[in-house]
Amino acid sequence: MQGAAKQYMETELFEFAFWPDFFAQLDRLAEMALPEAWRFREPDYAPRNDRTPILERYLKDVFRLLAIRYNQAEETWAEEAAIMTCGRGACFHTGLFSRTYKGIYAYFIPNRKDVSMRKWHFKDFCEENSPLLKYTVPLPQRPQLIMNARSEAFHPGWPIRVNARHILEDAENLSRIPQALQSFGNLPLLLDAAVELGRRQALAEPGIIAPQFYHGRMQFLMPLYLSGRSKADLAMALSIGDGYYIGETCLTPQMAYLNARLLARPTAGWLKDLMALPSTKIP
């Protein structure tokens, strides 16, 4: 007799559960967690969520990562390490810590609301020692990304292969370049020069490089200065080759921050400069 067929998890947060007053729940999570800036000082566009748009994106990215791990798991213990589900409830580790350095979990109960067909209903964010989790054993693990030896650190001595003209032929890439430079005749040459300058800067200041996890792969984000040295105009996503990097696409600095935040709070100055001050402080 064959075992029961595997039940696959929805990978989108709003498909997994019904969230009443989602933005207010994010406000509560921001208050629980260690203080962090969850919005940009001067956003590229006006988001619907004007208080915690970065936290919103982060939580959705974390859940998607965990749901994919759940779906790929071949053993029950590996499923439960990502997202724990049972008749009583469901939960996952948000990857964030409270102000007393306890893990923060998102907890769900079975959905019995007629307004939604989702299986789960969001109940609360809670610390790892919350009574809500007393029947959850073991607790799901904190989401972590395992990097292989070649992707643990950026190697500024490696060459960067960039086809600047090909990148700039893509309308989406071109739209991310400051408008004043988009019609610049020698833009491919300018982009090539900015990449080489970024590589040389990384030799002197390794901290300017930020890692990101994109479509299941580790990449590095390198700032590009096209119009001056006061602030980065772009970030180039570098994929890891065999002893070299491949410059595949250009991102705005704010896009780079959103991607990098899934791994950790970015510490590179060119990314930190984008942020508004945290609205709360540790008591």
What residues fall within each predicted segment?
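An acidic, glycine-rich, mixed-charge low-complexity segment common to nucleic-acid enzymes
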Residues: 1-215
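Compact beta-sheet-dominated globular domain cores
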Residues: 217-281
